[in-house]
């Protein structure tokens, strides 16, 4: 549960995580980097789908 809260907070601050930030989060949360990367991708996709946008570029 704590991991999820941290990921959500990080996502709120920045939808695109940097490699350096991903590495440090992975260590802090005892996850591997690819798990964090995929979580961010899935979260962005879920938001895009929920907003009904056809073009992801319009999110910027």
Swiss-Prot record:
GO CC annotation terms, alphabetical: nucleus
Keyword Cell cycle: no
Cell location: Nucleus
Keywords per UniProt: Developmental protein, DNA-binding, Homeobox, Nucleus
Signal peptide range: none
DNA-binding residues (ranges): 1-41
PROSITE patterns: HOMEOBOX_1, HOMEOBOX_2
GO annotation terms (biological process): neuron differentiation; regulation of transcription by RNA polymerase II
Record carries keyword DNA-binding: yes
Membrane-spanning intervals of the chain: none
SMART domains registered for this protein in UniProt: HOX
MF annotations from Gene Ontology: DNA-binding transcription factor activity, RNA polymerase II-specific; RNA polymerase II cis-regulatory region sequence-specific DNA binding
Role according to the record: Required for proper formation of the apical ectodermal ridge and correct dorsal-ventral patterning in the limb.
Family affiliation: Belongs to the engrailed homeobox family.
Protein name: Homeobox protein engrailed-1-A
Origin species: Xenopus laevis
Phylogenetic classification of the source organism: Eukaryota, Metazoa, Chordata, Craniata, Vertebrata
Gene: en1-a
